[in-house]
Structures are given as structure tokens and as C-alpha cells.
Amino acid sequence: MLDPILLNLPSCIETPRLTLRPPRTGDGPALHQALSESLPELRRFLASLPWVAAEQTLESAEMFCRNGEANFVSRKDLPFLVFEKRAGNLVASAGLHRTAWQTPKSEVGYWCRTSATGNGFVTEAVIALSEYAFQHIRAVRVELITDEENVASCRVAERAGFVLEGVLRNERRAPDASLRNTCVYARFPNAA
């Protein structure tokens, strides 16, 4: 198998309404603004998104962007920032994570800027990332894992053509020590 770092993966994904591209040096302010606006909503699901519990600073957002840029090049992770074409605004962050290159398979993850919810942007991005995984990584499956209580995320999975494979009961602990269930969805190339 070819070392993943040698794969020539496109660094831009275009959909009818969105541009997805890896984070770049200098994207920190836009990311910080979107995160700051969205923290109350994101923190409802700390069991799935533990990183949002930490203070989100301009510096930490810029560090995420620089690390994301490096990780994309090294193929350790494939993060993307999602921009609305019409207005040019950062509307979401999404990516292909925990890629098992030998299989190959990947997990799609995302969060949406609060002011951009309800527009179908995340569903559009998840479909595009799934197709990217099937076409460029030759993935045989793409997983989407979410907290069972995150109904909006479950709807994204279903609208994007993912099938619920199972619910892992008492799979995570939330910061308040409550047990949470995790939904495991998957999509396959023949469903793309």
C-alpha cells in the first residue's frame, strides 16, 4: 500500500453552495469567531466534543488551524473548514478523522456555526466529504458517530445517506457523570 503522505489528495472540495478546504495559517480569527458564537450549543454535547470544555481563545483557534494544515499534509487527519460561497462566511468545521488507511475507512466529524444551522450546510458538507473519501481515499466505509441525544446530528446522518448500525449503550460519560449512548452510522460507496 502506498504511504498516505504520498497520496495526491485534492485540498479543496466544491459543492453548489460551499467550499471546503483545510485550515490555513491565519484562519484563526474566523474560526474563533464561529466557535465563540457556537459554544453554548456545542457544550450541550461535551461527551462527544470534550475539546469544547476548554477555553477557546484566538491563540487556540490559530493553533488548531496551523496543526490542521500540517495534519492534512502529513495525512494524520483531514480537517476542513466549510465556507458558504455566497457570503464567504465560515459556517462549519468538518473532516475525515481516524482514517484507517489499510482498510481504508474513515470517520466524518463536524460542528456547525450556530447562526448557520438549519440551512443544510452540514448535510451538504458530510455528503461531499463522504464522496471525497470514497473517490480519493478509496474508503470502503465512512462512519458517523454521535451522541444519541444530539437529534440534529442524527438527522444529518440520515439525510446524508448514512444507515444506523447500532446504538452503544452507556458508552460515554458526560462531564456531569451521566452515562450517554452513542449512535454509530455508516455509509458505503455503493450508496454514494
Where do the model's predicted regions map?
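Acyl-donor (CoA/ACP) binding surface of acyl/acetyltransferases
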Residues: 1-30, 34-44, 79-192
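Conserved GNAT-fold acetyl-CoA-binding loop/helix
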Residues: 41-66
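A short helix-loop-beta-strand connector motif used in the catalytic cores of GNAT acetyltransferases and
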Residues: 52-53, 66-81
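Generic, well-ordered alpha-helical segments
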Residues: 23, 34, 53-60, 74
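Intrinsically disordered, low-complexity regions
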Residues: 29, 52-55, 69, 167
